[in-house]
Regions:
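Short, contiguous strand/loop micro-motifs
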Residues: 4, 25-27, 91-93
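Generic hydrophobic, aliphatic-rich segments that mediate packing or membrane embedding
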Residues: 17, 38, 57-64, 86, ...
């Protein structure tokens, strides 16, 4: 869905994208299954073990940190700041803790992590 940016900050989309959006809007989907199937499709394209679509870079950072710290535990998803989880350090090379609209460190903390700059 790339195109020229406008003063409004949006991109024009192709007919194929519009058709896909229309199809999505006119049909019902079980969201959990859609997420699983979409992740599998993207993982195959990327030759990766798995994939997950997120809404933004911030969401991706927070969710990735939560997944690593929680080691797949659903408990951690609902209790990201629990004292039961002691290994929270996320090592970032100096200069990578940048502010892209929000500091990387803030999103690491959202996922329950603690930044350690190396």
């Amino acid at each position: 869905a790339s195109g020229k940016m406008t003063i409004l900050g949006v991109s024009k989309v192709s007919e194929a994208v519009l058709a896909a959006q229309r199809f999505g809007g006119e049909h019902f989907f079980e969201m959990s299954e859609l997420s699983v199937q979409t992740g599998a499709f993207l993982a195959n394209l990327l030759k990766a073990e798995d994939a997950q679509i997120v809404s933004s870079a911030s969401a991706g950072i927070a969710q990735a940190v939560a997944a690593l710290i929680g080691k797949g535990s659903l408990y951690h998803a609902y209790h990201p700041y629990t004292e039961k989880i002691e290994q929270r350090e996320i090592i970032l090379p100096k200069g990578h803790n940048v502010d892209y609209g929000t500091p990387v460190e803030v999103m690491v903390a959202q996922g329950g992590g603690q930044v350690v700059e190396a």
